[in-house]
Amino acid sequence: MLRLEFDGLFRNTDNEHTSAGIMCYGWRILRGKQVVAHGHGTFARGQNANSNIAEYLALVEGLEALLDMGVNHERVLVCGDAKSVISQMQGQASVSSPAVRPLYTRALRLARHFSKLRWQWLPRKHNRGADLLSRHALKHLWHDPDLYQSIIDRLHQAARSGLANRLLDMGGLRVYQSA
């Protein structure tokens, strides 16, 4: 059985109490106790950025990695510490946020490719592997002031162009390891 663990985090980028921000994600895929793939990355958005979107970005990236691995017919357990995301993906809760709905729909479409997929909520302390990856993406930004400033500049440019609601992909990494 494969296990996908995912996590996202959000950081506001300004002092005006808007919802502009940086959303980092991390995910890893395990076969037993062996990590066979992992990834992390960053998106930014000039408005409507939040931690739920970061969680969905992590989920979507992880599901896409599973598809890339061609494991559609294997048993897959998807685990995350965001109760709302797990409940929504299980059909137990609705998605009310228009900002989240497109990512939810995308995650649903990806999940339908797997014939034996189950969902499980994890307490945060049991999702440390994915959490460390999302934090690694954030640390990468903090340690590179030029990169961070370029993100802020792109957010301001998007806002001036009327595209503040667009997700800006600031880069990511996927690593696949042979089992």
Cite the ranges covered by each PLM segment.
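RNase H-like nuclease fold core
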Residues: 1-53, 65-69, 178
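Acidic two-metal-ion nuclease catalytic site recognized across multiple nuclease folds
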Residues: 145-179
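RNase H catalytic domain
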Residues: 9-16, 60-135, 140
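Intrinsic disorder/low-complexity segments enriched in polar/charged and small flexible residues
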Residues: 29, 121-123, 144
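Low-complexity, flexible helical/coil segments
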Residues: 37-43, 65, 112-117, 153-160
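Catalytic phosphate/metal-binding cores of nucleic-acid and nucleotide-processing enzymes, i.e., regions
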Residues: 56
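Alpha-helix boundary/interfacial micro-motifs
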Residues: 24, 98-100, 105, 140-142, ...
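Short, mixed-charge aromatic SLiMs
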Residues: 48, 83-88, 155-163
